[in-house]
Protein backbone atom coordinates (compact mmCIF):
# COMPACT_ATOMS: atom_id res chain seq x y z
CA UNK A 1 0.00 0.00 0.00
CA UNK A 2 1.01 3.62 -0.51
CA UNK A 3 0.32 6.24 2.14
CA UNK A 4 0.76 9.82 3.26
CA UNK A 5 -0.48 10.05 6.84
CA UNK A 6 -0.15 11.21 10.39
CA UNK A 7 1.67 8.45 12.26
CA UNK A 8 1.89 7.79 15.99
CA UNK A 9 5.22 7.15 17.70
CA UNK A 10 3.43 5.17 20.42
CA UNK A 11 3.94 1.38 20.52
CA UNK A 12 0.77 0.74 22.55
CA UNK A 13 -2.86 0.92 21.55
CA UNK A 14 -4.00 2.98 18.59
CA UNK A 15 -3.60 6.72 19.19
CA UNK A 16 -5.45 7.53 15.97
CA UNK A 17 -8.70 5.78 16.92
CA UNK A 18 -12.04 6.97 18.30
CA UNK A 19 -11.11 6.87 21.99
CA UNK A 20 -8.10 9.12 21.46
CA UNK A 21 -10.26 11.58 19.53
CA UNK A 22 -12.86 11.63 22.33
CA UNK A 23 -10.22 12.32 24.99
CA UNK A 24 -8.70 15.07 22.83
CA UNK A 25 -12.08 16.71 22.23
CA UNK A 26 -13.26 16.55 25.86
CA UNK A 27 -10.09 16.82 27.93
CA UNK A 28 -7.48 18.33 25.61
CA UNK A 29 -4.93 15.53 25.69
CA UNK A 30 -4.05 12.82 23.26
CA UNK A 31 -2.25 9.48 23.17
CA UNK A 32 0.38 10.55 20.59
CA UNK A 33 2.93 11.95 19.89
CA UNK A 34 2.68 12.16 16.12
CA UNK A 35 4.77 12.75 13.02
CA UNK A 36 4.07 12.79 9.29
CA UNK A 37 5.03 9.77 7.16
CA UNK A 38 4.78 9.04 3.46
CA UNK A 39 5.83 5.89 1.66
CA UNK A 40 4.93 2.36 0.63
CA UNK A 41 4.68 -0.93 2.52
CA UNK A 42 3.81 -4.56 1.91
CA UNK A 43 3.00 -7.00 4.68
CA UNK A 44 1.50 -10.26 5.83
CA UNK A 45 -0.79 -10.94 8.81
CA UNK A 46 -2.00 -14.22 10.29
CA UNK A 47 -4.27 -14.72 13.28
CA UNK A 48 -5.62 -17.78 15.07
CA UNK A 49 -7.11 -18.15 18.52
CA UNK A 50 -3.66 -18.61 20.08
CA UNK A 51 -1.19 -17.00 17.67
CA UNK A 52 -1.13 -13.66 15.92
CA UNK A 53 1.77 -12.43 13.85
CA UNK A 54 2.44 -9.73 11.31
CA UNK A 55 5.47 -8.65 9.32
CA UNK A 56 5.94 -5.86 6.82
CA UNK A 57 8.60 -4.28 4.62
CA UNK A 58 8.47 -0.51 4.21
CA UNK A 59 10.16 2.46 2.57
CA UNK A 60 9.12 5.86 3.85
CA UNK A 61 10.06 9.44 4.67
CA UNK A 62 9.39 11.10 8.04
CA UNK A 63 9.10 14.72 9.04
CA UNK A 64 7.60 16.85 11.79
CA UNK A 65 3.98 18.00 11.62
CA UNK A 66 2.77 21.02 13.56
CA UNK A 67 -0.24 20.90 15.84
CA UNK A 68 -3.11 22.70 14.12
CA UNK A 69 -5.57 23.29 16.97
CA UNK A 70 -5.95 23.54 20.74
CA UNK A 71 -9.74 23.25 20.66
CA UNK A 72 -11.25 21.10 23.41
CA UNK A 73 -13.93 21.39 26.07
CA UNK A 74 -11.24 21.58 28.77
CA UNK A 75 -9.43 24.35 26.89
CA UNK A 76 -12.65 26.36 26.61
CA UNK A 77 -13.08 26.00 30.38
CA UNK A 78 -9.61 27.41 31.07
CA UNK A 79 -7.26 24.44 30.99
CA UNK A 80 -3.84 25.22 29.52
CA UNK A 81 -3.05 24.33 25.92
CA UNK A 82 -1.79 20.80 25.24
CA UNK A 83 1.95 20.48 24.53
CA UNK A 84 3.27 21.00 20.99
CA UNK A 85 3.79 18.05 18.71
CA UNK A 86 7.11 16.21 18.67
CA UNK A 87 10.04 17.49 16.62
CA UNK A 88 10.53 14.42 14.45
CA UNK A 89 13.80 13.92 12.57
CA UNK A 90 13.52 14.35 8.79
CA UNK A 91 14.71 11.04 7.37
CA UNK A 92 14.14 8.57 4.54
CA UNK A 93 14.50 4.90 5.45
CA UNK A 94 13.65 1.37 4.35
CA UNK A 95 13.23 -1.54 6.70
CA UNK A 96 11.35 -4.44 8.23
CA UNK A 97 8.96 -4.53 11.20
CA UNK A 98 7.19 -7.43 12.87
CA UNK A 99 5.15 -8.52 15.87
CA UNK A 100 4.37 -11.97 17.31
CA UNK A 101 1.73 -12.53 20.00
CA UNK A 102 1.01 -15.86 21.72
CA UNK A 103 -1.93 -16.58 24.01
CA UNK A 104 -2.58 -19.42 26.46
CA UNK A 105 -6.12 -19.77 27.77
CA UNK A 106 -9.37 -18.23 26.57
CA UNK A 107 -11.71 -18.91 29.51
CA UNK A 108 -12.31 -15.65 31.43
CA UNK A 109 -12.93 -17.72 34.58
CA UNK A 110 -9.40 -19.20 34.43
CA UNK A 111 -5.83 -17.98 34.00
CA UNK A 112 -5.20 -16.26 30.66
CA UNK A 113 -1.65 -15.34 29.65
CA UNK A 114 -0.15 -13.64 26.62
CA UNK A 115 3.38 -13.02 25.41
CA UNK A 116 4.45 -10.54 22.75
CA UNK A 117 7.70 -9.73 20.97
CA UNK A 118 8.01 -6.90 18.49
CA UNK A 119 10.82 -5.22 16.62
CA UNK A 120 11.89 -3.08 13.72
CA UNK A 121 15.06 -2.34 11.75
CA UNK A 122 15.67 0.52 9.34
CA UNK A 123 18.48 1.71 7.06
CA UNK A 124 18.93 4.84 4.98
CA UNK A 125 19.61 8.29 6.40
CA UNK A 126 19.99 6.51 9.75
CA UNK A 127 20.57 2.90 10.75
CA UNK A 128 18.73 1.60 13.79
CA UNK A 129 16.91 -1.35 15.32
CA UNK A 130 14.31 -1.77 18.08
CA UNK A 131 13.41 -4.89 20.06
CA UNK A 132 10.87 -5.30 22.88
CA UNK A 133 9.07 -8.08 24.73
CA UNK A 134 6.01 -8.14 26.97
CA UNK A 135 3.66 -10.47 28.83
CA UNK A 136 0.30 -10.29 30.60
CA UNK A 137 -1.53 -12.55 33.03
CA UNK A 138 -5.18 -12.22 34.05
CA UNK A 139 -6.59 -14.49 36.76
CA UNK A 140 -9.85 -14.76 38.73
CA UNK A 141 -9.30 -14.88 42.50
CA UNK A 142 -12.29 -15.11 44.86
CA UNK A 143 -15.53 -13.26 45.76
CA UNK A 144 -15.81 -11.92 42.19
CA UNK A 145 -12.30 -10.49 42.56
CA UNK A 146 -9.81 -10.66 39.71
CA UNK A 147 -6.29 -9.46 39.10
CA UNK A 148 -3.96 -8.77 36.21
CA UNK A 149 -0.24 -8.18 35.84
CA UNK A 150 1.47 -6.78 32.77
CA UNK A 151 5.16 -6.16 32.13
CA UNK A 152 7.29 -5.22 29.14
CA UNK A 153 10.78 -4.00 28.36
CA UNK A 154 12.69 -2.97 25.27
CA UNK A 155 15.80 -1.35 23.88
CA UNK A 156 17.20 0.13 20.69
CA UNK A 157 20.42 -0.07 18.70
CA UNK A 158 22.19 2.36 16.41
CA UNK A 159 21.22 5.92 15.55
CA UNK A 160 17.58 5.92 16.60
CA UNK A 161 15.48 8.85 15.29
CA UNK A 162 13.35 10.77 17.77
CA UNK A 163 10.13 9.31 16.41
CA UNK A 164 11.31 5.72 16.98
CA UNK A 165 12.20 6.11 20.64
CA UNK A 166 9.88 4.56 23.23
CA UNK A 167 7.08 6.75 24.62
CA UNK A 168 5.83 5.18 27.85
CA UNK A 169 2.86 7.31 28.92
CA UNK A 170 -0.85 7.01 28.28
CA UNK A 171 -3.81 4.73 29.04
CA UNK A 172 -1.95 1.62 27.84
CA UNK A 173 1.26 2.40 29.79
CA UNK A 174 1.76 4.87 32.68
CA UNK A 175 -1.47 6.82 33.10
CA UNK A 176 -1.70 10.54 34.00
CA UNK A 177 1.60 11.61 32.38
CA UNK A 178 2.03 13.53 29.11
CA UNK A 179 2.82 11.44 26.04
CA UNK A 180 6.36 12.86 25.71
CA UNK A 181 7.14 12.93 29.46
CA UNK A 182 8.54 9.37 29.66
CA UNK A 183 10.70 8.70 26.61
CA UNK A 184 14.04 7.12 25.80
CA UNK A 185 16.15 4.59 23.93
CA UNK A 186 15.12 1.82 26.35
CA UNK A 187 12.23 1.26 28.73
CA UNK A 188 10.59 -0.99 31.28
CA UNK A 189 6.95 -1.07 32.33
CA UNK A 190 4.89 -2.87 35.00
CA UNK A 191 1.12 -2.48 35.42
CA UNK A 192 -1.12 -4.12 38.00
CA UNK A 193 -4.90 -4.10 38.29
CA UNK A 194 -7.45 -5.50 40.74
CA UNK A 195 -11.15 -5.60 39.89
CA UNK A 196 -14.30 -6.65 41.71
CA UNK A 197 -17.73 -7.26 40.23
CA UNK A 198 -19.18 -8.94 37.19
CA UNK A 199 -18.19 -8.72 33.52
CA UNK A 200 -21.01 -6.26 32.88
CA UNK A 201 -19.79 -3.89 35.65
CA UNK A 202 -16.54 -3.87 37.64
CA UNK A 203 -14.75 -1.47 39.95
CA UNK A 204 -11.03 -1.36 39.26
CA UNK A 205 -7.94 -0.20 41.19
CA UNK A 206 -4.57 0.03 39.46
CA UNK A 207 -0.92 0.96 39.73
CA UNK A 208 1.45 1.79 36.86
CA UNK A 209 5.25 1.81 37.11
CA UNK A 210 7.65 2.63 34.29
CA UNK A 211 10.78 4.36 33.14
CA UNK A 212 12.56 5.21 29.89
CA UNK A 213 15.99 6.56 29.03
CA UNK A 214 19.47 5.33 28.17
CA UNK A 215 19.88 1.61 28.78
CA UNK A 216 22.98 2.07 30.97
CA UNK A 217 21.07 4.37 33.34
CA UNK A 218 17.67 2.71 33.32
CA UNK A 219 18.25 0.46 36.32
CA UNK A 220 19.18 3.34 38.63
CA UNK A 221 16.61 5.88 37.39
CA UNK A 222 13.61 6.74 39.55
CA UNK A 223 10.45 5.25 38.04
CA UNK A 224 7.33 7.12 37.12
CA UNK A 225 4.40 5.89 39.23
CA UNK A 226 0.67 6.43 38.84
CA UNK A 227 -2.25 5.01 40.82
CA UNK A 228 -5.99 5.29 40.53
CA UNK A 229 -9.33 3.63 40.05
CA UNK A 230 -12.02 3.24 37.49
CA UNK A 231 -15.14 1.58 36.18
CA UNK A 232 -15.16 -1.20 33.59
CA UNK A 233 -18.28 -2.00 31.57
CA UNK A 234 -18.99 -5.06 29.41
CA UNK A 235 -15.76 -6.87 30.35
CA UNK A 236 -13.52 -3.91 29.52
CA UNK A 237 -15.23 -2.91 26.29
CA UNK A 238 -15.75 0.56 27.81
CA UNK A 239 -13.48 1.85 30.56
CA UNK A 240 -13.29 5.10 32.55
CA UNK A 241 -10.33 5.80 34.87
CA UNK A 242 -9.23 8.55 37.23
CA UNK A 243 -5.43 8.41 37.54
CA UNK A 244 -2.95 10.36 39.64
CA UNK A 245 0.80 10.58 39.13
CA UNK A 246 2.48 10.11 42.50
CA UNK A 247 6.17 9.93 41.55
CA UNK A 248 8.28 11.07 38.63
CA UNK A 249 10.07 14.01 37.06
CA UNK A 250 7.90 16.92 36.01
CA UNK A 251 4.35 17.81 36.99
CA UNK A 252 2.18 15.28 38.84
CA UNK A 253 -1.49 15.58 38.00
CA UNK A 254 -4.91 14.02 38.01
CA UNK A 255 -6.17 12.68 34.70
CA UNK A 256 -9.57 11.33 33.66
CA UNK A 257 -9.42 8.79 30.83
CA UNK A 258 -12.05 7.17 28.62
CA UNK A 259 -11.00 4.24 26.48
CA UNK A 260 -12.08 1.00 24.84
CA UNK A 261 -10.99 -2.64 25.00
CA UNK A 262 -9.19 -2.54 28.36
CA UNK A 263 -7.46 -5.53 29.96
CA UNK A 264 -10.13 -5.74 32.68
What are these model-predicted stretches?
Residues 1-45, 72-217, 261:
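C-terminal outer-membrane beta-barrel translocator/porin domains of Gram-negative envelope proteins
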Residues 42-70:
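Aromatic- and glycine-enriched pocket-lining scaffold segments that form the walls
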Residues 48-50, 196-200, 233-235:
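A generic beta-sheet turn/junction motif
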Residues 55, 131-135, 205, 225-229, ...:
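One face of beta-strands
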Residues 203-206, 238-243:
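Conserved active-site loop/cleft motifs that coordinate metal ions or position small ligands
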Residues 217-231:
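A short alpha/beta connector and helix-capping loop motif
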Residues 229-237, 252-264:
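Outer-membrane beta-barrel "beta-signal"
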Residues 244-249:
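A short, acidic, flexible beta-alpha connecting loop/helix-capping segment that sits on the rim
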Amino acid sequence: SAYYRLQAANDWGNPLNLESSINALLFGYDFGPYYRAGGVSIGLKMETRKVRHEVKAFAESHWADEKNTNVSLANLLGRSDPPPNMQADEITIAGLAGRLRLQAGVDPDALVTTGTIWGEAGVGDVQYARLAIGATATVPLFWRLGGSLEWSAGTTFGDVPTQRLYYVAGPQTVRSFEANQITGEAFWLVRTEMAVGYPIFRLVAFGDFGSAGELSELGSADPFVAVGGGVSLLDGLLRADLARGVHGAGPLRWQFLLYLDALM
